[in-house]
Amino acid sequence: MGWWQVNADTLAGSRFVLSPLAETFAGLKLLHAGVPSHPGERAWLRRHLPGYRARLAADPVTALLVRSGLGREWIADFLTPTPRGDEPFEAEAARVRAARPEDARAHLRVSLAGPLPDALERDDLPARAAGLLEYVWTETVSPDWERRRRILEADVVARTAQVSRGGWAAVLDALRPGTRWLGENRLQVNAHEYPPREISGAELVFVPVTPRAGWVSWEERERYAVVYPATGVLAPEPAPAGLGALLGAGRARVLILLASPMSTTQLVASTGQGLGSVGRHLRVLLDAGMVERRRAGRSVLYSRTAAGDVLVKAAASGPG
C-alpha cells in the first residue's frame, strides 16, 4: 500500500478545495474508460462519448498520449497538477500546458512502466494534453459546472461537519477505496506498493469530484492532494415506480438519496429541486418516521430510518 507520513499540524491545517481541472480530468478518465458506474454517468456518456471518440480518431497522437498517460497503476504526473484552490479552469490548464516536454515524457514512461512509443518522442505533449482537457471542459463539464459545483460544495460542507463530529480519522476512512487513517501519523492513500512519503510541513488538500474517480498528486515537497468522489452524483438511482406513485416523484427521489446522510444543501444540489420543495419533502418524511435528522457541527444531516429502508426495499421488489 502507498502511505504518507502526516504530522498532526499538517493534518489540522489541511483543507478541502474545488478544482475545475480535477473535475475535468475525472471526466476524461470516465470518457477514456467508457463504463458508467451509475445512471447519471450512463446518461452523460451517451451524450458525450461519440464526440470524444471522434475527436481522438482524428488525432491519433493525442489518443496515444491519453492511453499512455492513464496507466493501470499510475497517472502521468503532468496531467494532474496539484490543485491550489480558487483557480479558474484556464489557470489550471495553463499549468498543464507549461509542463516541460522532457518532464512530460519522463512521466509517461512511469505511467507506462516501460519505454515511450516512438510517436510520443516529441515536444508538444503538454500542449496536446492541455488542448484535450480544454475540449473536455468546454464540451462536457463547463455547461453543467454550476450544478456540479453545488454538489461539490455540499460534499465539502458534509465532510467538514464530519471532521467536527468524529475527527479526521472518520473522514479519511470513508473518503474513497484504498484511503484510510492507519494511526501513528500515517495516511494510506492507495492500495499500490509505493515507498512512503514524508509530507509533514507541506500543504495538504482534499479535492472532491462528481465522477467515481480518485487519485493523488503532489508538487515537489510543497503541496499534496487527494482527489476523491463526492457523495452527491450527477443523477440518483431512479425511484421505483410504485414509490413515486405513493409519495410523489420528488419526495421519492429524496428518500432514495437518503440511503446515506445528506444535508439539505446536498439534496438541493443532487435533485435539482428548490430549497423550499426539499424542505417540505423532509418535513413530511420526518413526520412519517421515514427519515431522521441529527446535527453534525453546524450542519443538519438527514438519513433514512429503518422504516424508510423497508419502504424503499418493498417498492423496489415490486408486488408479491
Predicted region positions:
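Generic serine detector
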Residues: 14, 19, 37, 68, ...
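C-terminal regulatory or interaction extensions
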Residues: 157-246
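Extended mid-to-C-terminal alpha-helical interaction segments
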Residues: 205-320
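N-terminal, charged low-complexity regulatory/assembly segments
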Residues: 1-189, 194-197
